[in-house]
Amino acid sequence: MKIVIPGGSGQLGTILARELIAQDHQVIVLSRKPFLAPWPVVLWDAKNLGGWQASFDNADVVINLAGRSVNCRYNPENRSQILNSRVDATRVVGKAISNASTPPRVWLQASTATIYSHRFDSPNDDIRGVLGGNEPNVPDTWKFSIDVARAWEHAAEELDLPGTRRVLMRAAMTMSPEQDGVFAVLVGLVKRGLGGTNGDGAQYVSWIHDIDFVRSVFWLIDHDLSGPINLSSPNPLPNADFMRILRKAAKIPVGLPATRWMLELGAIFLKTETELILKSRRVVPSKLLASGFKFQFPTWEQAAEDLMTRWNSRQLTC
């Protein structure tokens, strides 16, 4: 297959492209900055149509991952960049698909599990899940993230594309032993003795192992699913359990807990937001499971053991 990955220069794009190439698919990555890779990299500005759109002709699949990182403080400038980078890129991808002489049969569009409400009572699935933003006393930063997710998905649905099946990938945190990812940050905290419970520890953590992320993307390409699809493990768990299991996998029995005020203060110094830690994301992938998808790493115990083994192996070879 010929597969185009706009915004594919980040961790997820690299993981996907590497596996696609290994399976003898043709991969083209669209990037705002040139970089060396084992696959063609085509420049685009993620906003306007240009010569890059020729790569869409005769493509089988487009996987749009473009969007500025949310690992920052949500000041006005960053908010504008977070929103516009997603909406602008998604709109222009839709236009390029519409203009293609032979449009791709599948458009996989990145979204986020953050779109769901902060809840503890029952999980949010992709059939009856409750979208967030209207909870009582919802923090402004949490509402902003949900508003971005809604606008992001809306941008993917603006055009009529009868020849292209669209999937909105509502992905949870993807855990990978690659450098600079969320797992690397968590392991760094654990190894410094700071991997204890965050806040009261009751908030749910939704996640997906990187191997299952890649497998689920392949599944979505090959199976007739459309609309919002949750890419997450079927077993989210409270933060206290999540961190305890990670410490066990890292063979570090103790981790200092962090209260909410400590996290808020730390987020200021680290130039990030506590929403990434304190919001309860209890998300399950009902549509994937109903379609027959089987997770290789359905539980955090299994995933954490594998990820730590791979992490330690990477450290030995670096």
Regions found by a protein language model. Give the residues of each.
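NAD(P)H-binding glycine-rich loop region in Rossmannoid oxidoreductase-like domains
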Residues: 35-92
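N-terminal Rossmann NAD(P)H-binding glycine-rich loop of SDR-like oxidoreductase domains
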Residues: 3-23
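Alpha-helical substrate-binding/gating segment
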Residues: 160, 187-196, 202-237
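Active-site Tyr-X1-5-Lys
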Residues: 136-166
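Conserved Rossmann-fold NAD(P)-dependent oxidoreductase catalytic core, especially the SDR/UDP-sugar
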Residues: 91-142
